[in-house]
Amino acid sequence: MQFSTTPTLEGQSIVEYCGVVTGEAILGANIFRDFFAGIRDIVGGRSGAYEKELRKAREIAFQELGEQAKALGADAVVGIDIDYETVGKDGSMLMVSVSGTAVKTRR
């Protein structure tokens, strides 16, 4: 499965648009509590543990996106948008969402 933020894939023609696909992953409140409790993990202004959790959530969202596209018979997803948003009544969770258009391509 190919993923692209652009509307086309270089060297390939889109032969069919299969539909919009999405993927989401939510990081619970524990990641924020752990993040602030482990603030000493920050090196050079960055937290390795927090970045690792965000990366994991993004990978889960992309996996869901790919599974939806595959179920539609697509071999690529184009026009991908990645969003990060706080959710929950007190904003204690972070949602990573990805969306794009599932397509069939030909070289």
From Swiss-Prot:
Matching Gene3D superfamilies: Hypothetical protein apc22750. Chain B
Xref: InterPro entries: UPF0145_dom_sf (IPR035439), UPF0145_YbjQ-like (IPR002765)
Membership in a protein family: Belongs to the UPF0145 family.
Name of the protein described by the UniProt record: UPF0145 protein YbjQ
Organism field: Salmonella arizonae (strain ATCC BAA-731 / CDC346-86 / RSK2980)
